[in-house]
Amino acid sequence: KKVYAIKPLTFMNNSGVCIKELIEYFKIDAKNVIVFHDDIDIDLGKIKAKFGGSSAGHNGIESIDKFIGKDYSRVRVGIGKPEEKTKVSNHVLDDFAENEEEKIKDITDNIVKLVPTLINKEMDLFSSKVNQNLNGI
């Protein structure tokens, strides 16, 4: 199988434009697209993967939904909630703290090891194994 790893260089709110152009250029069905994105409702360093669903207010996902529909896979990468609710916009845009970077490195390593599971659309198994490996299991 061919796999393309693509990071749009557009603003997040315009992610859908880029994704639509890429799936048209490479002739990829939206059902074969996997989008990774941050999620403040998931603890830092944990993930949840699923096919389809709502944007849950994520502007980048809303843009993608608008341009290619909702029938694609998503991997929601937890960044946790800010200590003060009023600082959500800063939280999602700030760099990770030094102690958080280690968690991000660990989850990235686990994701890379489990890419074949993700490509086979075993979303629950992928989520479970990535998160298990983070707990030292």
Task: Provide a role label for each language-model segment.
Residues 1-52, 62-75, 82-87, 94, ...:
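Nucleotide and nucleotide-moiety/phosphate-recognizing core
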Residues 55:
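Conserved TIR/SEFIR loop-to-helix hotspot centered on a Trp-containing motif
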Residues 59:
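Hydrophobic secondary-structure segments that place a key small or acidic residue at a functional site
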